[in-house]
Amino acid sequence: MIIKRTPQAASPLASWLSYLENLHSKTIDLGLERVSQVAARLGVLKPAPFVFTVAGTNGKGTTCRTLESILMAAGYKVGVYSSPHLVRYTERVRVQGQELPESAHTASFAEIESARGDISLTYFEYGTLSALWLFKQAQLDVVILEVGLGGRLDATNIVDADVAVVTSIALDHTDWLGPDRESIGREKAGIFRSEKPAIVGEPEMPSTIADVAQEKSALLQRRGVEWNYSVTDHDWTFSDAHGTLENLPLPLVPQPNAATALAALRASGLEVSENAIRDGIASAILPGRFQIVSESPRVIFDVAHNPHAAEYLTGRMKALPKNGRVLAVIGMLHDKDIAGTLAWLKSVVDDWYCAPLEGPRGATAEQLLEHLGNGKSFDSVAQAWDAAMAGAKAEDTVLVCGSFHTVAHVMEVIDARRSGGK
């Protein structure tokens, strides 16, 4: 393996990212010993006075965004670490809702490079340490960490969470986390801490989560048991041991995730007014999550890439008033449950525009078509997008879905043409 010359603090971000991608022998190397050692050297194991850590198969990003939005509305200084990014690496770290300049990231990478010595780190471990270092520099009140993969052995778990959250449990990453919901639940519950709140948004919670909570003496708070919510056409109600909040504004993010965020917030003991809760819920939005970007034709971006997310997306699509046809631009990774994901989407999609994703994990357009029976194949996401938009009438809907990569490609095409005047 050839490792490129080490970049410097002033080197471009792209040079650093290329270096990080080739630094470690494995893309994923679960375990906390190496990354903990470097974190201790950097002094970043406590990045802020209060930390939320959020795990789950789906819903992590929007749960984090809702927490962030409410806490900022309440006047807290907040940092969020999330992954993967859609278009820019800098999306992964937000301070007060804003991305940091590339120079901040490269400065953090240089600090980590100096501190790690001969300890090898994966791309994600490096990114996690970078986020923690940036948060420490920013002198925040609250940090929200989104788990990358699983929980127990994820790099984010080097930090002791004051409140741990598991949003949902479904089959994904089974090669790493185990073959069933019970195994996956145990891995995700690995973020729980003794005598600290452990919030579970999954309504059908695997028993292993309760087992881990008991083993760790965590304060388990389950949806439908310790807290719950109900929804009408125009508002929703939340209830827990602290009381009931009524007439809450309907969120722009998935309802279960907004409720899970609220459960975590109320368990935290942080002082937040009811007005801040309402304002934060109303303003929380995350790109690529049922994001309606235009009308006539309506264009929707959604990163749904497994059956659980596709089921939710299908429900949202069915709830929309339907006038014309639904044209789907889709690309997926071959290690996802392609058949299970497409089985849900088939009920709402009329025309398929299938594209390959690059890299060793990318599925070909032909692999997608095997599960569809009909549809068109293209050489790239950009070509599929152009064809769908050319074929869409004003009353139609163009849905871009299947992967973060698919949505990101289309976003990049739109941005490039906008900046190029096309």
Residue ranges of predicted features:
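Nucleotide phosphate-binding/pyrophosphate-handling subdomain across enzymes
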Residues: A48-F50, Q137, V142-V147, D154-V165, ...
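Beta-strand->loop->alpha-helix junctions that form or flank phosphate-binding loops
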Residues: Y81-P84, V200-E202, Q214-V231, L248-L252, ...
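C-terminal helical cap/extension that packs against the catalytic core
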Residues: I199, P203-L220, S230-D235, R266, ...
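Active-site-proximal loop/hinge segments that shape catalytic or ion-binding/gating pockets
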Residues: S403
